[in-house]
């Protein structure tokens, strides 16, 4: 990325929507080193505010000035502002929730390794786990019939026969693992 930032004569935008769940460092500390760097983040993931549709853009003063000139006036409504402020005042709570999700993600991945029809568990720095299975549509429908909602990603590019499991609470993850184990036995 640094090579691109140094050589590319244009903007380089880094989407850090899931940065709070990642072991990677944010690019924010390098923002002043690269005038063409733009970093976007969201309050949808770690902060759990997907419904308010609020993101943050970090960039040089020059880029922010251009963005301010082209954005609509009053583009963030008062209710969104209030909800964002309320949640931002609970940063320690959010950090604890993220830490819990990261721990649950590790546990979930460990347990998924024993499911026979899971062919690949992809590395993740998110609040979900992407897996390749023997037959995504079949497994998706079986899980739905057990009352478990997952995402069938088989129609997405490079995700043929993949399911996406959102990392839940310990109880939710155990329910998922139990259902997967039952399906593995019954095949």
Language model segments and positions:
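Hydrophobic C-terminal alpha-helix "anchor/cap" residues
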Residues: 31, 112-113, 143, 180
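Active-site pre-lysine segment of PLP-dependent enzymes
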Residues: 1-12, 16-46
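PLP-dependent enzyme catalytic core of the Aspartate aminotransferase-like
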Residues: 145-146, 156-187
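Short beta-strand-to-loop capping motifs
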Residues: 59, 131-134, 167-169
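Conserved PLP-binding catalytic core of the aspartate aminotransferase-like
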Residues: 101-102, 115-146
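Short acidic/glycine-enriched loop/turn segments that link adjacent beta-strands
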Residues: 51, 125-126, 157-161
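PLP-dependent aminotransferase class I/II
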Residues: 36-114, 120-121
């Amino acid at each position: 990325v640094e090579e691109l930032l140094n050589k590319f004569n244009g903007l380089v935008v880094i989407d850090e929507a899931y940065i709070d769940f990642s072991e990677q460092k944010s690019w924010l500390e390098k923002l002043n080193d690269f005038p063409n760097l733009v970093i976007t983040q969201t309050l949808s993931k770690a902060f759990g505010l997907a419904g308010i549709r609020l993101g943050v853009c970090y960039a040089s003063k020059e880029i922010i000035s251009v963005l301010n000139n082209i954005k609509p006036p009053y583009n963030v409504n008062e209710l969104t502002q209030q909800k964002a402020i309320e949640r931002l005042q609970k940063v320690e709570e959010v950090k604890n929730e993220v830490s819990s999700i990261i721990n649950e993600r590790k546990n979930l991945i460990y347990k998924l390794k024993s499911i026979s029809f899971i062919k690949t568990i992809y590395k993740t720095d998110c609040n979900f786990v992407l897996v390749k299975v023997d037959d995504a549509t079949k497994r998706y429908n079986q899980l739905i019939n057990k009352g478990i909602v997952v995402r069938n990603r088989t129609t997405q590019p490079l995700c043929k026969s993949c399911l996406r499991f959102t990392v839940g609470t310990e109880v939710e993850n155990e329910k998922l693992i139990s259902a997967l184990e039952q399906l593995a036995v019954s095949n």
